[in-house]
Amino acid sequence: MKLVRADDAAPEVLDRARAIYEDGFPPHLRASFENLLRDDLVVLVDDEPIGVAVLRPLAGTGWVFLRYFVAASRGRGAGTLLWEHVTRAMGEVGHVRMVYDVEDPAERGVEPDEVTIRKRRIGFYLRQGARLLPVREFVPPQGEVVQPMLLMAVDLGGGPTAPIVGADLRAVVEAVYEHRYGLVAGDPVVRRTLEVSGLA
């Protein structure tokens, strides 16, 4: 079993990776597959592809943003294997923290089945040692869609993830907004998140 970078993957591996990605996310949450190839797309291969992750370094921070993470099957351990391989690989190349956003199960108007899915997703990440960050009103630009998200993070040094608070938390919020979503610290959206999270 190994992680294969998109640049090194055979066409049939990329075709299967595309299928896993498109099956794993609804259309409103998907970027084009070609867009993913601008970042670091990796595929976990065990005879055939079983999971896909897309990552983007958060310039100059030592952190990496996990854009997408999806296993071909759920409930069979593929997600845990993918997580272990990705976090190990990111640590080996020098990243000290992985940050990502997840859909908020408390978002208004969400169907009960979707609430359950979102809670399970967060539960999976918590079991892997990640932390939900105490950030409120994190609203990354997603085209026409305005969707509040939650931020999570995991330290990649091998030990438990320490609480992320104060100036460290502010730096995470600003880095994600700037290097993932293109919003600088003075943007009203960023300022609002920092203010309501007690980080201004």
Model-identified regions with their sequence ranges:
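Conserved GNAT acetyl-CoA-binding A-motif
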Residues: 90-113
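Short amphipathic alpha-helix that is part of the acyltransferase structural core
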Residues: 1-32, 172-179
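A conserved beta-strand-loop-helix scaffold within acyl/acetyltransferase catalytic domains
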Residues: 14, 22-73
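Conserved active-site tyrosine of GNAT-family acetyltransferases
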Residues: 125
